[in-house]
Structures are given as structure tokens and as C-alpha cells.
């Protein structure tokens, strides 16, 4: 289902949203006008969250063996990947026809660097299942020609027919992928300067030294994420409760990038009790 091109860098226009009502649900303006539904699956803890998210991804792979999975990195989806590997080892999943496209990659890190997202994905999923290496796609962090790399990656995503299911986490400031607050909603793949809060959050992966954290990254844009046929977000911990409430029960605004998911026709939020404690 195509994503209507009415998103600007600054505001969401309610009349324009209503013009696309068959595809997208309008933003929450007030209780009387509210007509969208964010599908929420509440889980008791991180393990339960990971299991239920893996259930959704497993169903996608089983029902469409040659599906395109949009994959995410960070701490939250690790448990989901562990469950997928378990199911592969039990003979329940076959990744041989699956194509993957990752959300993002640090700019300037060689893929063999232990903290590159290429390494993360191989360590947590790809090395443990039968996905064809030729079907694995990530932005090339070593390509310092940002314009060329962004065009290349957008072309890759188009060439595989777009994303069937996009897995996401959410940052404390509402970023998804490396789409930081105030980034335009209508961007495809682009190069971003990482926000200080993002650098702070990611320094734990670099021995706690923020000087080692790359300061730029390539990321799928909001436009590309919204074009996915299904979007699945995983969220856990009390530290995410405030942003979950703000993103999905507040206004749709580039100040909170994840808020745009309120308008996606097939968005599922899977969270533990702590993360969903304020909604």
C-alpha cells in the first residue's frame, strides 16, 4: 500500500490526511476526531516481548518465504533474534529465500569493525540461520560519497520490491533508525549527524567512550519506513515509558519521529509492562 506524499518537515495537515483516509488514519487531534488505532501487544517482560515479536516475524517468513525483512540493531531486538535462531534450529523457519535490508549503518566504520551494524547482524542472526549472503543488504559505511551511497541503497530497496515487515526500536527522544528529532518526514536514505543523546546512548557499545562513537550514519528515511507493508516496534523498560506515551498518544510531529507511525496502516507495538506503563 503506497505511502501518500503529504508529509512536510514541519507539520501534519489534517485535511491532507483525511484526503488519504482510505490509506492512513488521521492524527490524534481530540477524542471526538480520533479514528486511528495503534495495535498494542502487552507482554509481561523482555523475554515475553521477544517471543511475541519473533512470533510475528516467524509468521511473515512462513507465509511468504521470499519476504523482505527490514531489520534493526541495538539492544532491544537481540532477544527477538535469539528466538528466531531457536526456531530455525528447531526446523520451524527457513531463511533461504528471505531478503534483508537493514535500517542503518555507521558512516566511517569498516564492516568488520565489531560495532558496525554489519557485524552486529551477523553476530546476532545471519551467522546462525541459512540466509543467502547475497540477499543481505546494509548501507555501506565505508562509502564516504554520501549522495552516491544514499541513492544506491534506495535503489536496492526498490529493486527488491520494498519491505514486507520492518522491525524497529525507539530511542529515548523518539528517533527510529537514525532519523533524529526534526528530520523531515519525506526523506529516503540519507546521511545524518548523530544527536548528542544518541551518541550518549550508544557509547556503551564503545567501551563507554563517546569519542569512539561515529558521529554520522546512513539511515533509511521516514518515507522508506512508512512504505513498509507492516511495521513492528519492540520496546522494553521503564526508561521508554515516557517516549512511548509521547510518540503514540501525542501529536504527530517531526519533533518525535516515531509519532508518524500513528499513521501507518499496519503498525504493531510490542512492549513489556514497564515500557507500556503510562498508556
Where do the model's predicted regions map?
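Short, Lys/Arg-enriched N-terminal segments with co-localized hydrophobic residues
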Residues: 24-37
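N-terminal glycine-/serine-/threonine-rich phosphate-binding loop
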Residues: 36-69
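Glycine-rich N-terminal segment of FAD-binding domains in flavoprotein oxidoreductases
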Residues: 63-89
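Ligand-binding beta-strand-loop-alpha-helix segment within the catalytic cores
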Residues: 93-166
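Class I SAM-dependent methyltransferase SAM-binding "motif I" and its flanking Rossmann-like core
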Residues: 177-222
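ATP/nucleoside-binding phosphotransfer catalytic cores, i.e., glycine-rich phosphate-binding loops
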Residues: 220-223, 227-279
Amino acid at each position: 500500500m503506497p505511502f501518500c506524499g503529504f508529509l512536510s518537515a514541519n507539520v501534519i495537515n489534517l485535511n491532507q490526511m483525511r484526503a488519504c483516509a482510505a490509506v492512513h488514519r488521521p492524527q490524534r487531534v481530540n477524542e471526538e476526531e480520533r479514528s486511528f488505532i495503534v495495535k498494542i501487544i502487552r507482554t509481561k517482560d523482555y523475554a515475553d516481548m521477544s517471543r511475541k515479536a519473533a512470533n510475528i516475524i516467524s509468521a511473515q517468513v512462513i507465509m511468504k518465504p521470499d519476504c523482505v525483512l527490514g531489520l534493526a540493531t541495538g539492544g532491544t531486538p537481540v532477544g527477538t533474534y535469539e528466538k528466531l535462531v531457536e526456531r530455525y534450529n528447531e526446523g520451524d523457519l527457513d531463511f533461504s529465500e528471505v531478503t534483508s535490508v537493514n535500517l542503518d549503518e555507521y558512516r566511517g566504520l569498516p564492516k568488520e569493525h565489531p560495532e558496525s551494524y554489519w557485524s552486529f547482524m551477523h553476530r546476532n542472526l545471519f551467522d546462525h540461520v541459512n540466509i543467502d549472503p547475497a540477499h543481505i543488504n546494509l548501507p555501506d559505511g565505508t562509502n564516504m560519497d554520501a549522495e552516491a551511497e544514499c541513492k544506491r541503497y534506495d535503489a536496492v530497496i526498490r529493486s527488491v520490491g520494498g519491505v514486507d515487515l520492518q522491525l524497529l526500536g525507539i530511542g529515548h527522544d523518539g528517533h527510529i533508525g537514525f532519523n533524529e528529532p526534526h528530520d523531515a518526514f519525506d526523506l529516503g536514505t540519507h546521511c545524518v549527524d548523530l544527536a548528542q543523546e544518541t551518541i550518549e546512548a550508544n557509547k556503551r557499545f564503545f567501551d563507554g567512550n563517546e569519542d569512539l562513537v561515529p558521529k554520522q550514519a546512513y539511515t533509511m528515511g521516514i518515507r522508506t519506513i512508512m512504505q513498509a507493508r507492516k511495521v513492528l516496534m519492540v520496546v522494553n523498560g521503564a526508561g521508554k515509558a515516557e517516549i512511548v506515551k509521547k510518540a503514540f498518544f501525542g501529536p504527530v510531529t517531526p519533533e518525535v519521529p516515531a509519532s508518524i507511525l500513528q499513521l501507518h496502516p499496519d503498525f504493531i507495538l510490542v512492549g513489556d509492562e514497564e515500557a507500556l506503563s503510562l498508556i
